[in-house]
Structure formats: C-alpha cells, structure tokens
Amino acid sequence: MEEAIAELEGGYKAIGCASGMAAVHTLIAGMVKSGDHIVCSESVYGATSVLLSTIMPEFGVETTFVDSSEIEQVKNAIKPNTRMIYIETPGNPTLAITDLAAVEKIAKEKGIYFAIDNTFMSPILQKPFEFGADFIIHSMTKYLNGHADVVAGIIVVKTPEHYAILRKMSNHFGGVIDPFNSFLVHRGLKTLSLRVLRQQENAQKIAEFLENHPKIDNIQFPGLPSHPQYELAKRQQKGSGSMISIELKGGYEAGTKLMDNVKLFQLA
C-alpha cells in the first residue's frame, strides 16, 4: 500500500499512519522542533488548525495562519525561525487555491520545508512534488480508500533522509496503520481513478446547477469560471475535484435548516 501511494505521488517512500491526524502530527513532530515556527494556510482541516494553534505551542512550536491564496501573506509571515510552510490546496473548506510554484520559490529561498495536504485532490488530480513540495499528506479515510470503512493517513517523502526520520517517529509514537486497514486502502486504490473522475464529473454538474440557484449566496468550486483562482487551478491541477463550498442566503439559520433536512449527506 505504501509503495503504491509513493509511486502514485512520484515520491521516494511513504509512511502509513493510523489516521490523517496521526500523519500530520508525525510530520510536525519529526521535522519541527521547540523554538521553530510554521506558516500554515488558514483554510485547513479543522483538527490540523487545532493541533497547530493550541497543542504545538505547549511544545514550543508557534504557527502563523495566513490566507495562502494571497502569496504576499505567505512571504510576509516568514520569520528567522520558520521551519515549515504547510499548505492545504484547495483550501478546506473554502476551496481557495494556493499558487504552489510561488510558495516553493519562497521555501527554497529561505531553506525551509514545504508540506502539502493533498487530500482534496488525490494523486489523480494534483502532483505536489512537481511543484517542489518536500512532503505530501493524505487522509486516506477519504478518496484514497473511498469506501467509508477505514480511518487512516499517510506521509509521502522525497528523500531517504526524511523517510528515516519519519519512519522512526511513526514507529515510536505508535500512530501506525494496521495491516487490515492497509489491505482495505490498497483495495480502494484499484478504483481510485474511476471514482475520482466520476465524482468530479458529478460535482461539476451540481456546481453549475447551484451557481444560479436563488437560495445560494455564494459558491466556490474550482471548476467554475467564477472561482477567483479558476485560471490558477487549470494550470496547477489536473481537474477541479469534487468538493463544493456554498454560502446560503439566510446565513447560519438557513444552513442549519438545510443540514437538518438532507438525506444523502452527513457530517464527515
């Protein structure tokens, strides 16, 4: 399973973890030390935000959250002790797109690590190593497994040195994936391309329908020309993915009413 995902991402090797957050924590704990600083997308998975904003400061690691779709914010947040730039693109849940080539240039100039959470795209639609990433994170619970019967994560690395550090960290932290979940994820990989492309096709039709719906105030979907980074998404991604972010007219009350009445969707 690890070999298959490393090959899909074009990496050296991969480290399977017990969850997406086990992967994030292993990466941070392995590559960042007390006194270091991280620059992170503000539109990032909620548990990643909590880890970096409330838990890692207790271990001497500070994080600055920025709108990474505005590259100047990334550049201006760099400090002398910045050790890593951590990007999730498209953003979760705003679907804002970060210019990965521009971030890679900053990271290279400053000599700092560049990590990308590629969960929303999968290796089918985005190849972070082609844009200079040092590390790729996935929550395999989502697209990679694809059958809603596994909780798992993975880190993909480019170098033997980083692999040795993170494999040791994973083994001794204990957040390793078990053999049966590895088997299930490997099963899911066999249909990954078919699933991702069909989901994307369906999402495009749904987004086009919702864009002109009278009860929708705003919609963010990289496959719509109205998306602020539509052209960047076309250059950087091999597709728009299948995540859609909407804002309803009527705000929180309207959103609550909608979620209380949906039949197919549930809290992920």
Where are the predicted features?
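Short glycine-enriched loop/turn motifs at secondary-structure junctions
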Residues: 8-9, 147-150, 238-241
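Acidic-histidine catalytic/liganding microenvironments
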Residues: 8, 210-214, 262
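Conserved C-terminal alpha-helix-loop-beta "cap" of PLP-dependent enzymes
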Residues: 216-268
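Conserved PLP-enzyme active-site core in the AAT-like
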Residues: 14-215
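Aromatic- and Gly/Pro-rich amphipathic surface segment
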Residues: 1-9
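A generic structural signal for nonpolar/aromatic side chains embedded in well-ordered alpha-helices
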Residues: 5, 166, 210, 258-259
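Short glycine-rich, polar/acidic loop-and-turn segments at beta strand-coil junctions
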Residues: 9, 18-21, 42, 223, ...
